[in-house]
Amino acid sequence: MSFSFRRIALIFAPAAVLLAVGGIAAGTATAGTTGTPHHRAQTAQAAPPVDHQLCYNAYGSQFAIPSGIRLINQFSPNGFIPVITPTVTVHCNPVQKTASGVVYPITNPNAHLACYPISETTQPTPTVVVTNQFGSATLVPSQPNLLCVPSWKSLTGPPGKSPTTPPNLNHFTCYPVSVKSGAYHPPTVLLQDEFASAPVSASVNPVPSELCLPTEKILPSGQVFPIINPTLHLLCFQVSQTPIIPQVWDENQFGTSPITISSTKWLCAPSTKTVVSS
């Protein structure tokens, strides 16, 4: 991408994000009014956009996670305390996506996601309608299985950042989903993240795998990591293989670890959500 084109794309990044969720600005305003009073308060501020994420099967085990972390999201407004496995199994990079000639640029290049398996007592999983640039469908979530944490990433060694959480990216709780009705129709896309030297053509499976909800995280110490953008979720689809770098380093509030990257897993698209039944 030329400098002038990139500059234009970045100027219109917020518009691209709205297009990415169906071009429904009114729906964005409405969705932000749901949830707890804390979540509603976020709408008084301009929420940063949410990038597409290209996620990889990964392994990294040098993290220390305290017990007693409480997660709050729109499915579980009273929160729940999961058991969090201190091993990263999914690593996500912000990715530039080009679909049908429209470029969705990266707006927060330093903010990645490191995802940890979770287990918990049974949580509410209401049926939802999820809409993005690939279409709209009614989805039935299963129990949450991942906590994705904003993380710094380095290709050469421990990032050594302070604070250890990059700004302007939500935590996410992810739920496996099945399609009840409707369908997504993703075209062939071009993807470029930090692992690729140029845009790569990729095929996206039209059946989504996971829905990731913006999540407030509360540490046992009382420290709160609030929801930054309550409206935009991530809906993740299996995607064909793209270039990888075999080892990176992730850093977040749980520590720093080398991460082994094994294969491309998902393309996660910014999406809006409406609850249709509990």
Where does each model-flagged region fall?
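Bacterial N-terminal signal peptides that target proteins for export
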Residues: 2-13
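Bacterial N-terminal signal peptides
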Residues: 12-23
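Generic low-complexity segments that are intrinsically disordered, proline-rich and/or Lys/Arg-biased
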Residues: 15, 38-43, 49, 67, ...
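C-terminal region of N-terminal signal peptides and the immediate post-cleavage residues
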Residues: 21-46
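Extracellular/lumenal glycan-associated surfaces
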Residues: 50-65, 109-124, 168-185, 230-246
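Short, flexible domain-boundary/linker segments around small modular repeats
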Residues: 69-106, 128-167, 189-226, 249-251, ...
